[in-house]
Amino acid sequence: MSIDDKVRAIVKEFKAYVPGKSKEEIARNYGIDPEKIIKLGSNENPWGCSPKIAEKLMDEVSKLHQYPQPINPELMEEISKFTKMPVENIIVGGDGADEVIDNIMRILIDEDDEVIIPIPTFTQYAISAKIHGANIKWAKFDEENGFKLDAESVLNNITEKTKAIFLCTPNNPTGNVIPTEDIKKIVESTDALVMIDHAYIEYSKEEYDLTNWALKYDNVLVLRTFSKVFGLAGQRVGYGVTSKKLVDYMMRIKPIFSLTRASQVSAITALQDKEFFKKCLKEGIESREEIYNGLKKFKQLEVYPTEANYMLVKVKNGMNSSEFCEALLKKGVIVRDCYSFEGLEPYYFRVSIGTFEENERFLKIMSEIVE
């Protein structure tokens, strides 16, 4: 009997996650100087993390032989102040928000339970749900309507077997927010857990932030992360805000030491450096507008409005997305080919914000390819 015979059938159905390409990979494959590569493919903060973090991390080096605190009171307090949510309604994950997603699926899902996911959206939702035995019911962000959520496609899929519904807002990769009235309708129409993914909410208008719904509704869990505006994608810190009861259940099965000492210190310092946060947010929104307005000038592209730190672009010059992204790679520009997103035709790519210098170079290269 081979190892293939022992592997679960559901795992054999999966395709490996396709992450954004790294500068190192492109430098190797195309012989380009890494310093000249523009990385606009992974929704990162191009200005990095708070410069105060490096100093704090040096203080931690002498403690790396010690286990981290399973729950860091200082980190919990800082998150509480930032979100204006009680500490007891917060749970922190050490693999970004992915850990919170996975823990929720472990808690909720029995074989043949159902999870509703509108597509296109973040692919990790379906992977985590399926591996724990759920059947996926697909709803949709309507392409013909600017990728607005088709709320009826969610509501019509709700059954007595529905355990969870994922709503990403702003949605990845489309960048648009889900209207609050649609989310309210969904939350109030079911007792299934509605997971509102706010990974990019800092870049949106304040009115779209529904984090406080975790106190208003027992069936809401809001996902947040340090990977975007805080510039800590490499430290993998995320958190959930939800009912005290659900936090208690998650704490029973959460990996004990999943959040490293370095990650804890980095997250605390990032929250405390409010000036750097404000700078990154302000310049991030300005960068987004610069790229959006620049791309809108190309008639061969359709650029979708966004409330995140990236935007979705449709190629209409006869090339598919893979051909277009390959042309950019050869010139040292990394964007995200969206061919692997369920529910998207092979003509879309996603581009993240860059520094203003990177944006200028990117738009110049785009003009060479498009025109």
Curated annotation (Swiss-Prot):
GO MF term list: histidinol-phosphate transaminase activity; pyridoxal phosphate binding
Annotated metabolic or biological route of this protein: Amino-acid biosynthesis; L-histidine biosynthesis; L-histidine from 5-phospho-alpha-D-ribose 1-diphosphate: step 7/9
Matches recorded under Pfam families: Aminotran_1_2
Record's catalysed reaction(s): L-histidinol phosphate + 2-oxoglutarate = 3-(imidazol-4-yl)-2-oxopropyl phosphate + L-glutamate
Source superkingdom: Archaea
Its EC number(s): 2.6.1.9
Recorded coiled-coil stretches: none
Enzyme's top EC category: transferase
Designated name of the protein: Histidinol-phosphate aminotransferase
